[in-house]
């Protein structure tokens, strides 16, 4: 059986030894923690863990950048097209006015041709000659006849 008087001494001795051991362990841990080769090992470990995720994100970012560049090109092209169309409204208005004039002139020509056709059908014409030439020939003959009658 242990001696009751030696128990407090033993407890002090154990406490002092445990304190010394814990200080040495803490110092060893600090040294290991600050050792350069261990730090490099931890960096390599971190890099190996995080690099595949970074590479995947970079690939996704590159793909999204290409998609956004295409969308930006399409938007700029659309904006320039709409701006050009807005600037061309005066040209379109001018074309519409010219088309209206053409339709009006065509209607006038059709009306004149139908009027001439109906008037020529009603009046007598000399075959092979136009009405205007027949009228000129008639006038020439009538003036010759009137001058010969006067003489």
From Swiss-Prot:
It comes from the Eukaryota. The keyword Membrane applies. One of its GO terms (cellular component) is lysosomal membrane. Its main location: membrane. It is found in: Lysosome membrane. InterPro entries: BORCS8. Residues 116-151 are annotated as: Disordered. Residues 116-127 have a biased composition (Polar residues). Keywords: Lysosome, Membrane. Belongs to the BORCS8 family. May participate in the coupling of lysosomes to microtubule plus-end-directed kinesin motor. This is BLOC-1-related complex subunit 8 homolog. It comes from Caenorhabditis elegans. The gene is blos-9.
